UniProtKB/Swiss-Prot annotation:
High-level lineage: Eukaryota, Metazoa, Chordata, Craniata, Vertebrata
Residues holding GTP: 756-763
Keyword field: Cytoplasm, Fertilization, GTP-binding, Hydrolase, Nucleotide-binding, Phosphoprotein, Repeat, TPR repeat
Any single GO CC term annotated in Swiss-Prot or TrEMBL for this entry: cilium
Protein's name according to its UniProt entry: Sperm-associated antigen 1
Note: Antibodies against SPAG1 interfere with fertilization.
Annotated spans, Disordered: 322-437, 694-776
Gene transcribed to yield this protein: Spag1
Chief subcellular location: cytoplasm
Native source organism of the sequence: Mus musculus
SUPFAM superfamilies tied to this protein: TPR-like
Modified residues (Phosphoserine): 351, 359, 703, 739-740, 766
Each TPR repeat, start to end: 213-246, 247-279, 280-313, 430-464, 472-505, 507-539, 606-639, 640-673
GO biological process: axonemal dynein complex assembly; single fertilization
Length: 901
């Protein structure tokens, strides 16, 4: 009975609806009340409204209420509303609607009549350009007649067999090519000639004219972007004929600038400015036309107007700088400038005032010295490359050299002014004259600056020694002006006078040395540079110049060039360094004498600076370390360790002359200093003084700890006895220091490679234990790779574990880079297993996690053998057995799966 009921549900149930196949039992009040399915209720409501199962108004209304409670915004609740008719409104409402419609229709008809039909009295001659009104008298078939006439052309007759015998293929092909080229040229010209430059706008409204103008402007923009500027000009002209606008004038001006039609572009820019006086683009493009028409002052005015509106306009800034440079170069040369010869000027010195306010005017650095050097270095290199030693005192730079003189002008100089400053007045005080001279010097007007300094000097000369410092500064500043102009002899005279007033002043010495070098008086220049280095050996310009002149003198005079030098004056140790004083001090304040005891704060500062310098040496940043050691020597100039440390930096940088000076100074303080003697020998060897290089290391051998000097002497004299046993390989040994109080710590690479490998032990001898590696934290991938390769060569698991302990795990993929090899990978695993897993399992887990993210990790897993996998498994077993906070067995198991274990 049950099976039959399932086979024939219609016998026991009521069936389903045709739409949606809903059971008939669901069309019931009780089911609809309990139903919470919105979609199903919507289907039931649709069936009830359709009436396919009968009309049940109450059930339909009940279903709507239930659906409203469940989903008030359901689309099924919406009912169709028929369009409203006149009967749907009241009489007043319908009358209002009807009047609005009638007024709209009449207004549209009136506008159509005004667009197409005009009064001949008000618009005479308008009907002529307009097409005739279409009517029965028009003949619409004129185009077809012309087409039929054009078709009556002579037909092509095939060639007969006799003509084919005389047919020349190459000749016919060349004819076809020529015809194709001619047609191509003709088509290009025809394309431009067919474009009319004027649009008939008679009878059009303003809206229609604006539409036509915008359409033609868009065509011009497309032609401009494609590079066809001629076509763009024609389309912009058509747009302007329809409706003149400032935008169209601007666009046509830009296209004409591309075609280099400066006059037409200028006219368009002026018309655009008439329509829109503050148009930025018009001003910018007019400035461009002024620039190419050599109207530089007008261009400057326009560009400044642009920058007032848009201060961040990069194009305006760039163009203004170019125009101002051209304007300055086009100025006539004054009478004062014709007295000297102009040199090539690459950049302007930071300040021409030595005694001005601020640390920038009182501190001497390499940048300002290089600026004061001018073009001397380049001239010397050219002289050496040519092999000649001819004088360059009469050379006049070209136009490009004159342009380079004004590239580095400061904001204090008014570069846009075309007039020259007025002559100095005798009534001005010396400080005002000096300040004005500094401004002129910064602006590149060296002759005018020298005139200002001369008047100030004339006012202060009668006072004598009362204003010696001020006079020294003025003479030095005027010497800088003479040096810029190439007047080296006057520069030397002023520097001599400045040094008479204030001996051992750095800037006059430097400028006199540059002038001597320009005049090719290299011995005097070398003496001045060496004097500067005695005052302050941290001036890079003096150091480089001394080394360069030493090479030149070696070429000129041979190995005995030092014997021909003038005597180098000895600088008193108590001589104050006026240019290196801090900003808070004045040149009149004397620093603390060298023999006075430093205070507690000085000792702390000295130690801090020394440690910073040692750390910089460890990081191989030798230049910054030298600056730190310079500060240390200002606090205590009797510290022998500082001189030896700085000598080491100079040796690393290849500055052997400075290293030699520091070593000699250290030996004056401590005559038995081993390191100073050894580094002095290295410096002399670097200077190729072979005779002197063999003396000091032999003296150093008296010390039992100077094994490095013994090796140096052995390599020089080549007198070491042959070793017994098998041949040992030579290892590069860098300088090793055992004293932490006197020397900076060794870099990671130096310490890693400092211990030579012992290949064998002689009979009867005992093997000495290998020196423990001093591993420091690497700062980049290169240093990490160098240290790791050294550790791998020694198979030192303890050193590798120490390296991993001081290395952040997140930095491991970056430090390894793509250098993960099989032996390196195995060494890392063994080090973690043997030394770190018991001490710090969390660190081991992090290292293993980040190691799996390194490059070539997956490749390494495919290359390791079974024994290496067992070691990895032992490491993970040890990691699982060790209890640690924050490390669960699930984490270790997930990491084990990454290692395919």
């Amino acid at each position: 009975m049950t099976a039959k009921a399932k086979d024939c549900p219609s016998l026991w149930g009521f069936g389903t609806t045709k739409t949606f196949k809903i059971p008939i039992e669901h069309l019931d009040f009780k089911y609809i009340e309990n139903c919470s399915d919105v979609k199903h209720l919507e289907k039931i409501l649709y069936v009830l409204r359709s009436g396919e199962e009968g009309y049940y108004p109450e059930l339909t209304e009940f279903c709507e209420k239930c659906l409203t409670n469940l989903a008030p915004k359901s689309r099924a609740l919406r009912k169709d509303k028929p369009a409203e008719t006149a009967s749907s409104f009241s009489a007043e409402e319908w009358e209002k609607i009807d009047s609005d419609l009638k007024s709209w229709v009449s207004e549209i008809k009136r506008e159509e009549n005004t667009c197409h039909f005009h009064d001949p009295e008000n618009h005479p001659g308008v009907e002529d350009p307009l097409p005739p009104v279409r009517g029965s008298t028009c003949c619409p078939h004129s185009g077809k007649e012309t087409y039929s006439k054009s078709k009556t052309a002579k037909k092509r007759i095939p060639r007969d067999y006799a003509e084919w015998d005389k047919f020349d293929v190459e000749k016919e092909c060349s004819k076809i090519d020529e015809d194709y080229k001619e047609k191509t040229v003709i088509n290009n010209k025809a394309h431009l000639s067919k474009i009319e430059t004027k649009i008939e706008t008679a009878g059009l409204t303003e809206k229609e004219k604006s539409f036509l103008a915008n359409r033609e402007k868009g065509k011009g923009n497309e032609a401009f972007y494609s590079g066809d500027y001629e076509e763009a000009v024609m389309y912009y002209t058509r747009s302007l004929s329809a409706l003149p606008t400032a935008i169209a004038y601007n666009n046509r001006a830009q296209a004409e600038i591309k075609l280099q039609r400066w006059s037409s572009a200028l006219e368009d820019c002026e018309k655009a400015l008439e329509l829109d006086p503050g148009n930025v683009k018009a001003l910018l493009r007019r400035a461009t036309t002024y620039k190419h028409q050599n109207k530089l002052q007008e261009a400057v005015d326009d560009l400044r107007k642009v920058l007032q509106v848009e201060p961040d306009n990069d194009l305006a800034k760039k163009t203004l700088s170019e125009v101002e440079r051209d304007l300055k170069n086009s100025e006539p040369v004054s009478e004062l400038q014709t007295k000297g010869k102009r040199m090539v000027i690459e950049e302007v010195e930071n300040s021409g005032d030595e005694g001005g306010k601020g640390s920038a005017d009182e501190r001497e650095d390499g940048g300002s010295d290089e600026a004061a050097m001018g073009n001397i270095q380049k001239k010397l290199m050219v002289r050496r490359s040519e092999g000649g030693r001819r004088s360059r005192r009469g050379r006049t730079p070209g136009p490009r050299a004159e342009q380079q003189g004004g590239l580095r002008e400061t904001a204090t100089a008014s570069t846009g002014d075309s007039h020259y400053p007025e002559e100095p007045r005798a009534a001005d005080n010396p400080s005002g004259l000096k300040r004005r001279g500094n401004e002129l010097f910064r602006g590149g007007q060296f002759a005018e600056a020298a005139a200002q300094y001369s008047v100030a000097i004339a006012q202060l000369e009668p006072t004598g020694s009362a204003n010696a410092d001020e006079l020294s500064i003025l003479y030095s500043n005027r010497a800088a002006c003479y040096l810029k102009e190439g007047n080296c002899r006057d520069c030397i005279q002023d520097c001599n006078r400045a040094l008479e007033l204030h001996p051992f002043s750095v800037k006059p010495l430097l400028r006199r040395a540059m002038a001597y070098e320009t005049l090719e008086q290299y011995r005097n220049a070398y003496v001045d540079y060496k004097t500067v280095l005695q005052i302050d050996c941290g001036i890079q310009l003096a150091s480089d110049s001394a080394n360069r002149i030493a090479r030149i003198l070696t070429e000129l005079d041979g190995s005995k060039w030092r014997e021909r030098l003038p005597p180098i004056p000895a600088v008193p140790t108590s001589e104050p360094l006026r240019v290196w004083l801090p900003a808070a001090e004045t040149p009149d304040q004397d620093p603390c004498p060298n023999n006075c005891m430093p205070s507690i704060t000085d000792e702390k500062m000295f130690q801090a600076l020394k440690e910073e310098g040692n750390q910089l040496v460890k990081d191989k940043n030798y230049k910054d370390a030298i600056s730190k050691y310079n500060e240390c020597l200002k606090i205590n100039s009797k510290a022998c360790a500082i001189y030896t440390n700085r000598a080491l930096c100079y040796l690393k940088l290849g500055q052997f002359e400075e290293a030699k000076l520091d070593c000699e100074q250290a030996l004056q303080i401590d005559g038995e200093n081993v390191k100073a003697s050894h580094r002095l020998a290295l410096a002399q060897k670097g200077l190729e003084n072979c005779r002197e290089s063999g003396v000091d290391p032999s003296q150093v051998l008296l010390s039992p700890d100077s094994s490095e000097a013994a090796r140096h002497l052995d390599t020089k004299n080549d007198t070491a006895p042959p070793s017994k046993g098998r041949e040992r390989r030579r290892i590069q040994v860098q300088e090793v220091d055992g004293s932490s109080d006197e020397e900076p710590e060794r870099p990671a690479e130096a310490s890693a490679t400092s211990a030579p490998a012992r290949d064998g032990v002689e009979d009867g001898g005992s093997a000495e234990p290998a020196e423990k590696l001093d591993v420091s934290k690497p700062t980049n991938a290169y240093e990490f790779g160098q240290v790791l390769s050294t550790i791998s060569a020694r198979k030192d698991e303890e050193a590798c574990a120490h390296l991993l302990a001081i290395t952040a795990p997140k930095d491991l993929p970056l430090l390894l880079s793509n250098k993960l090899e099989g032996d390196t990978f195995l060494l890392l695993i063994q080090s973690l297993k043997s030394h770190l897993v018991a001490k710090d399992p969390s660190l081991v887990y992090e290292h293993l996690l980040y190691l799996s993210k390194a490059e070539r990790f997956k490749t390494m897993l495919t290359l390791i053998n079974k024994g290496q996998k067992e070691q990895m498994a032992q490491l993970f077993d040890g990691l699982s057995d060790t209890q640690s906070d924050g490390l669960t067995a699930e984490d270790v198991q997930a990491l084990r799966r990454q290692y395919e274990l």
